Amino acid sequence: GSVLIVLGGTFSAVIASFPLDKLKKMGKHMTKLISGKKYQPEPVIETIIEFAQLARKDGLLVLEERANELEDPFFKKGILLVVDAMEAEKVREILENEVSSMIERHDGEVAIYDKASSYAPAFGMIGTLVGLVNMLKQMNLSEGSSDSLGTSMATALVTTFYGCILANLIFGPISKKLRIRNDEEVIYKQVIIEGVVGIQAGDNPKVLKEKLVSLLHQTSQQKILNGEEGGGGKKEKKSKKEK
């Protein structure tokens, strides 16, 4: 009964709070956490620098064929916009609008688990209150029923425990991990935006690389530095597997 009150109440409140089309994607959220795409900006930086060197040497048009080989649709779109000689401000605007829409979508995903995390303890407390009321109704001190007071109290309070478990061991960590994954994707795409605009502007590849690396977290910056000291890191798989 305690578990049903907490789970049933929490999920009912979530269903009442969000559109059904968003709730249907909760399974995809779990897939994203467990086996979703890993956004690693280090390899894409190497690809951007390679493209910058090609563009400075042979012109932007030479990148069209290479862009069509890219597996990342966002990166591909950015390079093709540059090849089409679109203004730098327009290129940035288009790509940043796409990132803004993505962030809004991600915030909606995280909000589901934030709400569930806040609802679970509340329904745990409701379950406890219901249990206490029932316990008080059944008390009859004249017949010695006070002996079972401890057991009844424990049963009532365990509902609060279940609510805290759901909030702090399930919904809270899911929300946190989704935020981390979402932040990784945002940084990855910000690197692509700055790289694409830098390629179009004809920035010096070394200067451009420093700029892109500065966007990363310190651990990623150190990884790139260690890769350079060790003779260079892996490059992104830029082309699809040849038949």
For every predicted segment, state its role.
Residues 1-109, 184-243:
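Large intracellular
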